[in-house]
């Protein structure tokens, strides 16, 4: 790489109207993914009542199959030329309608389907959803290329993270409100999915139509497989790969959330009382991180957030444990308040990794001349697929028994109860442990690799400024 005098990109590029419409698109995109994430497991366990061993197989298949397909999707996305419409915007526009349709189908199961046919149907819809939402995920990628200005980019990404957190929690309110007039759980899920789908499609189409991609880079065609080598050869990338691998084991904890809400509050539909405090805490946490970034570097904040997560989750466990042994409204309210405090940590774990990835992408771009916006997340996904698959495969087996095979779970959750507070005390305490303590431990471990991460402060700024110079050469050439 030839030496060039770094030049800072200070000009702001993103218009207010574009910024707002982009955030609207992000909100309703995550509203759709949030509907799937919050209620799909509840639907499979309490509506379809899939045996835990079969649900483990289902989770394994919908982790491995999409991962293989996404390998080719990542190569396709990063191999695309940046046309007049941009590189990512067209893909998000194309993905909007299929995402909406598949979201609804994820909560609609023909009654005639049983046994193997049912499993084939569920896996097919889930894999198709994964493909559509993977392309739809380019909605998030757009934030990285909307402006060459580093501070403006970080601002866009920060607000994207805040809006994503709120959008992810919105389905909890939607389903709760629907429950006022629709008493059947399956019906509530279908109506909720349909509402999220229609609004999500419209918002994504409007938002992606309004935004512009302004980061220029080489359009030279290269062997896409070389991009994987470039990522794996980057020392900073490995910090994120290892961290995200460890973090994905928290999937066991998040899987328990909706069932924990039922055990504490009587109905899984009341998960909103878990999701909202956590979501609000996440949004506040992101705002706090933005403020703290002026005083501390991102590495320090991420490590500190992991330590905080362990402490606050252990305290939440103690409060919940006390409540289950001596139930009172006061302790119940205190526990829910602690979910807000837990959510503060999500502010760091949701926002900072995306900033780390953006910085590493620039380091790779400076060294290779290539933008690997899809390849890098895919390589990270190799690790998260392994740990996430282990987590999602184990979670149902940890949660509830399967009488058809004689499988005995750790928690002993009983599906299909009218009042979930009827779960045994032992089951409630174990649910609580996995939901809080296990989550805290995983978030602490996710921060450990960052003790060795050096892409912060002046090093980060120097790399960004050099990349800006490099892009100008591509524009001029």
Spans of model-derived segments:
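Membrane-embedded alpha-helical bundles of multi-pass transporters/translocases
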Residues: 2-477
């Amino acid at each position: 790489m030839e030496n060039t005098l770094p030049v800072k990109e200070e000009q702001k590029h993103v218009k207010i109207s574009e910024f707002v419409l982009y955030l609207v698109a992000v909100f309703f995109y995550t509203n759709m993914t949030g509907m799937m994430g919050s209620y799909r497991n509840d639907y499979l366990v309490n509506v379809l009542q899939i045996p835990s061993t079969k649900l483990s197989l289902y989770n394994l298949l919908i982790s491995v199959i999409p991962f293989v397909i996404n390998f080719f999707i990542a190569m396709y996305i990063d191999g695309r030329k940046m046309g007049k419409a941009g590189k990512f915007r067209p893909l998000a526009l194309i993905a909007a309608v299929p995402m909406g349709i598949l979201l609804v189908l994820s909560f609609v199961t023909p009654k005639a389907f049983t046994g193997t046919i049912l499993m084939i149907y569920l896996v097919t819809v889930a894999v198709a959803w994964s493909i559509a939402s993977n392309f739809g995920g380019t909605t998030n990628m757009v934030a990285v290329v909307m402006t060459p200005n580093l501070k403006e980019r970080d601002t866009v990404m920060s607000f994207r993270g805040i809006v994503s957190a709120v959008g992810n929690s919105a389905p909890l309110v939607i389903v709760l409100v629907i429950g006022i007039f629709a008493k059947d759980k399956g019906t509530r899920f279908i109506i909720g999915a349909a509402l999220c789908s229609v609004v999500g499609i419209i918002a994504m189409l409007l938002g992606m139509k309004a935004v512009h991609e302004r980061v220029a880079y080489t359009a030279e065609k290269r062997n896409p497989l070389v991009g994987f080598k470039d990522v794996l050869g980057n020392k900073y990338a490995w910090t994120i790969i290892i961290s995200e691998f460890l973090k994905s084991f928290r999937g066991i904890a998040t899987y328990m959330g909706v069932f924990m809400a039922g055990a504490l509050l009587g109905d899984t539909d009341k998960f909103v009382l878990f999701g909202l405090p956590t979501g609000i805490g996440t949004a506040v946490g992101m705002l706090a991180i933005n403020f703290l970034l002026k005083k501390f570097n991102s590495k320090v904040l991420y490590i500190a957030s992991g330590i905080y997560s362990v402490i606050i989750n252990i305290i939440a466990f103690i409060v919940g444990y006390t409540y289950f042994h001596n139930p009172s409204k006061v302790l119940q309210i205190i526990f829910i308040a602690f979910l807000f405090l837990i959510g503060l940590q999500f502010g760091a774990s949701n926002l900072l990794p995306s900033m780390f990835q953006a910085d590493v992408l620039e380091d790779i771009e400076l060294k290779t001349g290539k933008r690997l916006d899809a390849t890098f997340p895919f390589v990270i996904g190799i690790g998260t697929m392994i740990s996430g698959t282990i987590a999602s495969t184990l979670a149902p087996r940890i949660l509830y028994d399967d009488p058809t095979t004689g499988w005995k779970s750790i928690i002993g959750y009983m599906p299909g109860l009218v009042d979930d507070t009827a779960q045994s005390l032992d089951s409630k305490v174990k649910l609580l442990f996995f939901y809080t303590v296990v989550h805290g431990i995983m978030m602490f471990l996710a921060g450990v690799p960052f003790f060795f991460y050096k892409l912060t402060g002046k090093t980060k700024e120097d790399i960004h400024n050099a990349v800006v110079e490099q892009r100008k050469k591509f524009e001029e050439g």
